[in-house]
Amino acid sequence: VEVEDAQYCAVVASGLLACTIPFLAFASAHSHVLVADTVYGPTRRFCDRTLKRLGVEIDYFDPLAGAGVDKLIRPNTHLIFLESPGSMTFEISDAPAIAAAARAKNVVTVLDNTWSGGVFHKPLALGIDVSVQANTKYASGGADVINGSILTNREDLISRMKETITDLGINVAPDDAYLVLRGLRSIETRMARHQSSGLEVARWLKQRPEVQRVLHPALEDDPGH
């Protein structure tokens, strides 16, 4: 099953590791990274606790900035990290515009693609350099493994990230890799049902007087639709 249409993939021991490895591979003391304001909470905590302590400069940006992210890029910006849909608030970022702005200044882009399971959203096809996801969520399918994946079509980037993985000694156990491969056999069927069921619940909630707002990008009146 092809879920991300990527040429290269590295598997790590958790989804959070998949998110943090690109930072460790491409950022260093005195370098600058841009992080979307709505990324996964533990990813943001890693930036605030660990990266800042290592001397990395971090700015959080509006996930709806689109091409406007160009104005935030500095000469020492090495990485732009975003999540789309945004974690918990589900904004849809203009990934192609962000990728184009970054590419023009030789900045690596990384997108946390966990919410789509790699099925509904193809970041690499939109120009993003690296797509990461927590296989723990959807790819495994059995709630019996903690795992993450890092995907790209660039050999230079995967080589750098694999070096970081090796240096930190965080290679994944073979049994865990097997469990994810098992789950991928049914991911398209499962994600289709997740999507239809979730949308049905979202539409029901919109009719409820107790609910002020429903955050779901598949709703026709959602800004990210």
Residue ranges and their predicted role:
Residues 8-207, 215, 220-221:
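Conserved PLP-enzyme active-site core in the AAT-like
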Residues 5:
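Portal/gating segments that form or line small-molecule/metal binding sites
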Residues 223-225:
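Contiguous C-terminal substrate-recognition/catalytic subdomains in enzyme active sites
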